[in-house]
């Protein structure tokens, strides 16, 4: 069985495309998206320069990563986690059998439960 249940991707795509009527009117159709993340990646990550300081995070923080995530791999979260020295109640959770699109995948319930549990347990900051 695949990671994404039958029909889920098509549903997601339909809902996502509906958020950009301007992109749908273009020929060929396109989904417009902000590219600031790509610029940050080029100017900071690829240059070996951090663009944020994990030590400045003072709110409860949940890092969730999926086992097979190639976009934000578990090693990335594992490297950041110990740097969150001022985050009360920080938590790092690696979820099995998932990718970067886990919110659509068959194990998405575990993701939702993890986030819900953290929100219910986290002290107000």
Regions from the PLM with identified roles:
Residues 1-62:
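Alpha/beta-hydrolase
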Residues 52, 72, 106:
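Residue-level signal for the nucleotide or nucleotide-sugar donor/cofactor binding architecture
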Residues 58-65, 69, 80, 90-93:
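Catalytic His-Asp charge-relay segment
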Residues 70-76:
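Conserved alpha/beta-hydrolase "acid-adjacent" motif
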Residues 84-87:
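Short helix-capping segments at alpha-helix termini
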Residues 92, 98-112:
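Catalytic histidine-centered segment of alpha/beta-hydrolase-like enzymes
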Residues 114-125:
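C-terminal alpha-helix
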């Amino acid at each position: 069985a695949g990671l994404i249940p039958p029909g889920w991707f098509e549903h997601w795509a339909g809902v996502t495309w509906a958020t950009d009527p301007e992109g749908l009117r273009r020929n060929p159709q396109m989904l417009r998206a902000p590219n600031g993340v790509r610029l940050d990646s080029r100017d900071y990550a690829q240059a070996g320069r951090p663009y944020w300081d994990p030590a400045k995070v003072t709110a409860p923080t949940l890092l969730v990563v999926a086992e097979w995530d190639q976009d934000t791999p578990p090693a990335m979260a594992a490297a950041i986690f110990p740097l969150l020295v001022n985050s009360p109640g920080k938590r790092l959770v690696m979820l099995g059998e998932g990718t970067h699109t886990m919110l659509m995948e068959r194990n998405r319930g575990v993701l939702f439960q993890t986030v819900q549990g953290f929100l219910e347990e986290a002290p107000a900051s």
